[in-house]
Amino acid sequence: MVKEIPQIAAQLYCVQDYLGTVKEFEFALDQLHQIGYRAVQYANRGVLAGDNPELSLVRAREAFERKGLVCSSAHRPWSALRDNTDIEIERLQTLGCSYVFLNFLEQPYDMHEADSYRRFSIDSVPVIQALEDAGLQIGFHNHSHEFQRNGPDGETLFEFMVECFDERFLFEPDVYWISNGAIDPAEVLARLKGRIPCVHVKDAEVIPVEGDGA
C-alpha cells in the first residue's frame, strides 16, 4: 500500500522533461500520485509554459483534480506580477494556489546588490496588497547568492531582505541552496519563524574533489 504524503508537494519544475505533451503531463501526474504525493507546485514548463499554454490552466486544474492532486503554490516572474497583476491573480486563482513565489530579482534590479533589494521592498508593496486583497500571498525562493555578505553592514543579502521587506512578504527557504551558501538551514528556518508557508527540500550529492591547496 502506498503511503500518502498529504503535506508534501512535488515541484513540477523537477519533472519538466516529462511535461512536453498533454499525454506526458497526465502520465507524470499519475506517477506522482502513485508515489504518494497529493499536491504539486506549478512551474511554467512544458505544456504549461507561456501566456497561452498548450494546456489551459482550467484544464490543468481539472487534470490535477482527476489525479487527486491540488496545486499548493506557483513560481512566477516578478515582471508578470508587476505588469499584469490582475491577470496573474486570475491565473493563481484558476490553479487554486494560495501562494506565489519569486525565484530571483530580475532586471532592472541587480540580484547581487543590497540597494536593489531595498528598492524592490518599496516597489513590491502595491502587488503585495493586491494579492492580499485577492486572498493570496507572495514570497521569495532563495538560491545561494543571497547569502553573499553584500549587505550595507556586512550582513548577508538574505538577512537584509528579511529586515527590509514588508512583513507580509513571505519566504520559501530552499535548504539545498542555503547549505550551498555555507549557511546552516536550521538557523535560517528559525530566523524566519512565522513567515514560512513552504520549504524546498532536495537531494545533494557529495562529490569528492581533489583540490589544489588548503
Task: Name what the model sees in each region.
Residues 10, 39-40, 131-214:
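Acidic/histidine-rich catalytic cores of soluble enzymes
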Residues 1-99:
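N-terminal pre-domain/capping segments
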Residues 27-31, 55-66, 86-94, 115, ...:
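Alpha-helical scaffolding segments of alpha/beta enzyme cores, especially the outer helices
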Residues 68-76, 97-107, 125-133, 168-173:
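Short, basic, helix/turn surface patches
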Residues 16-23, 42-56, 76-85, 107-112, ...:
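Acidic-and-aromatic substrate-binding clefts and catalytic sites of carbohydrate-active enzymes
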Residues 95-115, 134-146:
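Active-site groove signature of glycoside hydrolases
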Residues 13, 103-105, 202-204:
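Generic beta-structure capping elements
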